[in-house]
Amino acid sequence: MSSSDRPVRAARTKRSLYMEWAKTHSHAKYNLATSGLTGVSREEFPLDVRELEITAPGGYGHAPLLARLAVHTGVSEESIVTAAGTSMANHLAMAALLEPGDEIVLEQPAYGPLLDVANYLGARVKRLPRRFETRFSVSLEELQRAITTSTRLVVLSNLHNPTGALLSAQMVGAIGKLAIRARARVLIDEVYLEMLFGKPAPFCFPIGQSVAGAKENPFVVTSSLTKVYGLSGLRCGWILAAPALARRMWLLNDLFAATGALPAERLSVMALDHLEKFRDRARTLLAANRALLDSFLDSRRDIECFRPPAGTMVFPRLPHGRDPEAFFRLLREKFETTVVPGSFFEMPRHFRIGIGGDTPTLRAGLERLSAALDALTKR
């Protein structure tokens, strides 16, 4: 094994530089940094105050919410664990699966907090490259080489954050079979996957049940109502896992959250009862915004960009010889616009554009992004 193939156990980190940046530096008049759908207003939400409660008997999960999520995911309640958004779901899932020193294989580029949590938990991290030249796909051959008898967990996202690349059902099934042979698990963050809307979506948990047969499902899934539906404030996240593992996660969560916030859980039940309304809202908004994005990308010959089949984000690449940090500074200070610097995804020449905001803001933001690129070219 070469030195570059050896898993790395990084210094234990107790912060997320990306989340710190997002909370303190991403805000601008024209914010193209946010990857989720613009938030649902109080007027748009089907609020029934008669259904709200402040307190309820404790237990492992709010029964009405678990019932709704079982219908939504097509998974039995014994395999569902609720969490405060996908971020906490990822943390809880990884904490339940890993011990300090365990080997994991994690995609690269990756959403920063996934790597941060792995390092915080003391994992030895090997990287699985997802390359621009191959449309950020996963190479099954490279994954097979990366997995060893010591590998405890593989961590992926689908749709991929930051690129929006889609893992097909065939690829998900092949990854599941590989994990079963290696006696490893696969954590897939699917928080963006429901943006496929009417298209068949390769949700990995049922695929895992199919390929596992009598064996335990190798997949652990995390998701929430945040990104697709504009319901971030509810913090309605969940984990799908084999029943025994789900039970372990509930017990571990006693150390983290103990019980859920009942008013938010009741609001989440209301949201799930009217989810088609929020899905239609998202579909309509993204159809208009995708057209704006395509027009912008068609007009630029100075950036390269893989265009994913769905979702709210793309990950363009700046030309060689340009100073990315100077460009992001120019964009923010002169043009009042923010994107996410690629350095937060370990690819500093790239940047992430989010298209889930309101259409007028996106249109104006893309115009300013184009002007900033023109200014960069003239330097």
What is each model feature region?
Residues 2-88, 92, 273, 375-379:
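N-terminal small-domain helix-loop-helix segment of the aminotransferase-like
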Residues 4, 215-287, 294-296, 367, ...:
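Conserved core segment of the aminotransferase class I/II
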Residues 102, 123, 181-184, 190, ...:
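A short helix->loop->beta-strand "cap" motif at the edges of active sites that frequently abuts
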Residues 121, 181-182, 215, 300, ...:
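Helix C-cap/helix->beta junction micro-motif
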Residues 132-202:
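Active-site phosphate-binding strand-loop segment of PLP-dependent enzymes
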Residues 145, 329-339, 345-379:
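PLP-dependent enzyme catalytic core of the Aspartate aminotransferase-like
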Residues 269, 285-294, 305-318:
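Conserved glycine-rich beta-strand-loop-beta hairpin in the small C-terminal domain of fold type I
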